[in-house]
Amino acid sequence: MGQKVHPNGIRLGITKPWISTWYADKSDYANNLNSDWEVRKFLVEKLQAASVSKIVIERPAKSIRVTIHTARPGVVIGKKGEDVEVLRAAVSKLAGTPAQINIAEIRKPELDAKLVADSIAQQLERRVMFRRAMKRAVQNAMRIGAQGIKVQVSGRLGGAEIARDEWYREGRVPLHTLRADIDYSTSESHTQYGVIGVKVWIFKGEVLDGMLPQIEEPKQQQPKRKPRGK
């Protein structure tokens, strides 16, 4: 059976940046890696209502800088920035170094694979029909400007006795093209029948020489040539 490589992992260092960017000695590497995992776990649990897409961690000069990419920055910041200060103190305590927290707003959540997957998972938990949730996500992404999207749900769909998976795709999703800007993420929906897995692939365009994704022009059809002698 055909197995697919992780779309983000294969593009690291080519078109995708790492979500942890720091250098460390051999003796500190494991501690830093474990610290990153604990910080991410804490922030994801703390900011469940904030539509967090990803958390980027940097470690400049004996400190830690955390950038939270979210579609709802107001929820993270809180009233007069009080919530950010609480988060900063907690992250500093977890990491054991001075912490700085930056907020990056996601202006088009319909084009973010993690947010789309979480949205579908939440709808399934509210007993929305899975086909309706999938089709709505696909239509929204294509309307906003995606060049292609694929959504897959797996599990006891609709409370069925036998688990299965169903997928829906629109546009192009070229997984083998390394220069293609493919955003991929997963989520889980915990229903009364069990866990339903959600996978989302979004194709935003092609990255050329580190430039922003280029929107391809539709190809014009060549006029048919008439046979000679007619």
UniProtKB/Swiss-Prot annotation:
PROSITE patterns: KH_TYPE_2, RIBOSOMAL_S3. Residues 39-107 form the KH type-2 domain. Pfam families: KH_2, Ribosomal_S3_C. GO terms for molecular function: mRNA binding; rRNA binding; structural constituent of ribosome. GO terms for biological process: translation. InterPro entries: KH_dom, KH_dom-like_a/b, KH_dom_type_2, KH_sf_prok-type, Ribosomal_S3_C_sf, Ribosomal_uS3_bac-typ, Ribosomal_uS3_C, Ribosomal_uS3_CS. One of its GO terms (cellular component) is cytosolic small ribosomal subunit. The keyword rRNA-binding applies. Keywords: Ribonucleoprotein, Ribosomal protein, RNA-binding, rRNA-binding. PANTHER family: 30S/40S RIBOSOMAL PROTEIN S3, SMALL RIBOSOMAL SUBUNIT PROTEIN US3C. Part of the 30S ribosomal subunit. Forms a tight complex with proteins S10 and S14. NCBIfam families: rpsC_bact. Belongs to the universal ribosomal protein uS3 family. Binds the lower part of the 30S subunit head. Binds mRNA in the 70S ribosome, positioning it for translation. This is Small ribosomal subunit protein uS3. It comes from Shewanella sp. (strain W3-18-1). The gene is rpsC.
